[in-house]
Amino acid sequence: MKTIDLFAGCGGMSLGFMQAGFEIVAAVDNWRPAINTYQQNFTHPIHELDLAQIDAAVSLIKTHSPELIIGGPPCQDFSSAGKRDEGLGRANLTLDFAKIVLAIQPAWVIMENVERARLSKIHQQACSMLGDEGYSLAQVVLDASLCGVPQLRKRTFVIGHRHGSIADLANVLQQRLAKQSLTVRDYFGESLDTDYYYRHPRTYERRAIFSVNEPSPTIRGVNRPIPATYRMHPKDAGDVSLARPLTTKERSLIQTFPLDFKFVGTKSEQEQMIGNAVPVNLAFFLATSLQAYLNQPRMQQLSLLPSFF
């Protein structure tokens, strides 16, 4: 299925869908450090463009004739870091994403965002726009730790189809989830050579020491050393003297990027693009679930549905 990735970042969603057999024909982003990294790892083009420029975006995307548009509009205005403020401007990119999709009219669309985005007026408005123009929608919240990622990271996915109802797709996704969360030790074995690690908390009211025998907390866009004055939290998994911060590469591996994936830019830029990315295995889970759904006899009988796989 010819696919274009909008707000592609360094390519987590692209890579997961490629690994599942989708043809990524192009990607679009507006942050040069992420674009530089994307270009190091993929042979198809990534275009530098502000997707708020809807007319320019539509003209560009039409040249690639995508059958599927995937993308995660920036989510800072929906995130749990502080109060939500949908008036900050970046949340409006969710509406821009929907407008672009409606102008292109691909057979399929997948929109990713943070878990709480589904409660926002802008997210609901974007879904209404798609539904009003004939897209059947399925919405699901997926925990990455149940999708082959050693990380507690919940994300909202909206899947839209222009050629018939997909009301039962969310059930297919739920049925394919693992029965228990993947831990850091499950994924790395003993290769980290530590039982505990430090993840800098948003506030010191939260714990910062985690065990490899549990999933990682959500990988964020910052990675800081252990403060010399750090005070133990009652819920810390172990003593701070037994812990160390994860390296940039280790954080990318928790995001399930392959070992040979090349990140470029300053350390802070790399940390940010890693934290912003959709985990590769989460994207792969979503893509293979869509394949499984399309391969059901009922879906194959739809005369309007091309055979992509």
From Swiss-Prot:
SAM-dependent MTase C5-type domain location: 1-297
PANTHER family, alphabetically? CYTOSINE-SPECIFIC METHYLTRANSFERASE, DNA (CYTOSINE-5)-METHYLTRANSFERASE 1
Give the top-level enzyme category: transferase
Q: What is this protein called?
A: Type II methyltransferase M.HgiDI
Question: Its family?
Answer: Belongs to the class I-like SAM-binding methyltransferase superfamily. C5-methyltransferase family.
Q: Does S-adenosyl-L-methionine show up as a keyword for this record?
A: yes
Q: Which GO terms describe its biological process?
A: DNA restriction-modification system; methylation; negative regulation of gene expression via chromosomal CpG island methylation
- MF terms in GO: DNA (cytosine-5-)-methyltransferase activity; DNA binding
Enzyme Commission number(s) of this protein: 2.1.1.37
Please explain the role this protein plays, according to its UniProt record.
A methylase that recognizes the double-stranded sequence 5'-GRCGYC-3', methylates C-? on both strands, and protects the DNA from cleavage by the HgiDI endonuclease.
- Organism equals Herpetosiphon aurantiacus
The catalysed reaction is: a 2'-deoxycytidine in DNA + S-adenosyl-L-methionine = a 5-methyl-2'-deoxycytidine in DNA + S-adenosyl-L-homocysteine + H(+)
The organism's lineage is: Bacteria, Bacillati, Chloroflexota, Chloroflexia, Herpetosiphonales
Kindly give the PROSITE patterns that the UniProt entry links to this protein.
C5_MTASE_1, C5_MTASE_2, SAM_MT_C5
According to its UniProt record, which residues of this chain constitute the active site? Answer: C75
For this UniProt record, the keywords arranged alphabetically read as follows:
DNA-binding, Methyltransferase, Restriction system, S-adenosyl-L-methionine, Transferase
